[in-house]
A protein has these predicted regions:
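Conserved polymerase palm-domain catalytic core
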Residues: 147-250, 254-275, 310-312, 352-359, ...
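Generic alpha-helical secondary structure
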Residues: 56, 60, 106, 110, ...
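Active-site and adjacent loop segments of nucleotide-processing enzymes
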Residues: 304-404
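An acidic intrinsically disordered interaction segment
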Residues: 61-86, 180-190
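Active-site-proximal segment of RNA-dependent polymerases
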Residues: 110-172
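Polymerase palm active-site segment centered on the conserved acidic dipeptide of motif C
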Residues: 245-248, 255-349
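Non-catalytic, polymerase-adjacent accessory regions of viral genome-replication enzymes
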Residues: 1-70, 399, 403-404
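Short, conserved non-catalytic motifs in the polymerase core
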Residues: 44-50, 81-108, 124-136, 198-219
Length: 404
């Protein structure tokens, strides 16, 4: 794909989406577009896109100039601000992760690289790959696994979840660049931009929080899934796949099939191939799931306590069973805690604080898409959810009136 001014403008627009009034983005808009915060606010009140388009035009010109300097040898890199990394503890798994904060211009170049790579990504990424990408999030994974489990012709009886150790951190930049060099050897400007962006990582791997990096790891994961689905065994002259279906969510892989021995064989093979070829490590802590039949799950519905539970695939914050889906216990505990506190707030002061309203809205999807009607009724979830939406709407109206 050739580098054009329109492509740079589209990348800048996507990078600035919902971020126009952040402090660092406003500084960048004034530096390269010559438009102040007051002018942007005035234009936003009357739905005038002129100042924003002026900013995007100025940023696109700067991006083109930096890429031209990079290609003709006048510069060694894109002259971006260093990436700021900071530790954060995952509230669910309690793992310590090194997240990254990239400057606005870094994000613009990341979106530009994605737009250039989009034809390749559309061709290479499998329909069963899910991550923090548009229309391919955790809800999409939940629906896909539900369709697999409830489709009788597939005959899925077992599942195995694998986890790539330190996926982003241990995915070397040389591996990603080698794949791109093989796939698009003639895209000189695109390879140069991707090389400079990947080199910004302080540890030699992929950044957690970068826009381009999420797509690059999914490109690497596509080779893993293709390899898994290609494993077959030959019986009486007929090739039978070892794995019926396979998918991924971020650094988690799931293998589903009819026989546990076949899935186990495929897992051993892919672990060795990933280690030897991609220099990544799949953890030895496999998670095996043996699904029950629909009749057995229906029979257990009438039992009490732990006897009522059925084995399920815990992935992407959901637990998928044969005939129903539940929420991961840790997520449900956090959601229940917030709804109980919101109920106390509503009873005490007749309104829900804004910060808690955002949390209630974010947890609504877990109640909506799972078998949790009894819990939702006990927590009065729908009433609290509507009250939270009203609080957010009222805060937005108040903020808009103050801006005028």
């Amino acid at each position: 794909m050739p580098l054009t001014h329109e492509l740079c403008e589209q990348a800048a627009l996507e990078a600035f989406n919902d971020k126009w009034f952040r402090r660092n983005y406003l500084a960048m808009a004034e530096k390269y577009g010559g438009v102040t915060r007051a002018e942007l606010q005035t234009a936003a009140r009357v739905a005038d896109m002129g100042p924003r388009l002026e900013v995007v035009h100025g940023i696109a010109l700067e991006m083109e100039q930096r890429i031209d300097d990079l290609l003709d040898g006048s510069a060694n890199d894109l002259d971006l601000d260093p990436v700021h990394t900071f530790p954060r503890i995952d509230g669910i798994s309690m793992k310590l992760r090194q997240l990254s904060d990239c400057c606005p211009l870094h994000q613009c170049f990341g979106h530009l690289a994605y737009l250039g790579l989009r034809p390749l990504l559309r061709a290479r990424l499998l329909p069963y790959q899910f991550a923090s990408i548009p229309k391919k999030g955790q809800t999409a994974l939940k629906r896909q696994v539900e369709r697999w489990l409830r489709r009788k012709s597939l005959g899925i009886q077992h599942a195995l979840k694998l986890d790539v150790k330190g996926a982003y951190e241990h995915t070397k930049q040389e591996l990603v660049l080698a794949i791109l060099q093989y796939e698009i050897p003639l895209a000189a400007w695109l390879l140069a931009v991707v090389r400079c962006l990947l080199a910004m990582s302080p540890n030699g791997g992929l950044l957690i929080g970068g826009y381009l990096e999420a797509w690059m790891f999914n490109l690497v994961a596509s080779y893993i899934l293709v390899r898994i689905l290609g494993y077959v065994k030959t019986r009486r002259g007929v090739s039978v796949p070892l794995v019926v279906r396979s998918g991924s969510y971020m650094d988690d892989l799931v293998l589903m099939g009819r026989r546990w021995a076949d899935i186990q064989s495929a897992a051993r093979k892919i672990t060795k191939w990933v280690k030897d070829t991609l220099h990544l490590t799949i953890k030895n802590s496999w998670v095996r799931v043996d699904f029950l039949s629909p009749a057995e799950e229906h029979r257990r519905r009438h039992l009490k306590g732990a006897a009522k539970g059925c084995p399920g695939l815990d992935m992407a914050r959901y637990v998928m069973h044969r005939t129903y889906t539940t929420v991961r216990p840790g997520i449900f505990k956090r959601a229940r805690r917030q709804y109980m506190r919101a109920g106390a707030d509503l009873k005490r002061s007749h309104f829900i604080p804004l910060y808690r309203s955002y949390r209630l809205i974010s947890y609504n999807g877990y109640f909506k898409g799972t078998k949790s009607r009894a819990a939702a009724e006990a927590l009065n979830q729908q009433k609290l959810f509507k009250s939270a939406k009203w609080a957010v709407r009222a805060a937005a109206i108040k903020e808009r009136s103050l801006a005028v």
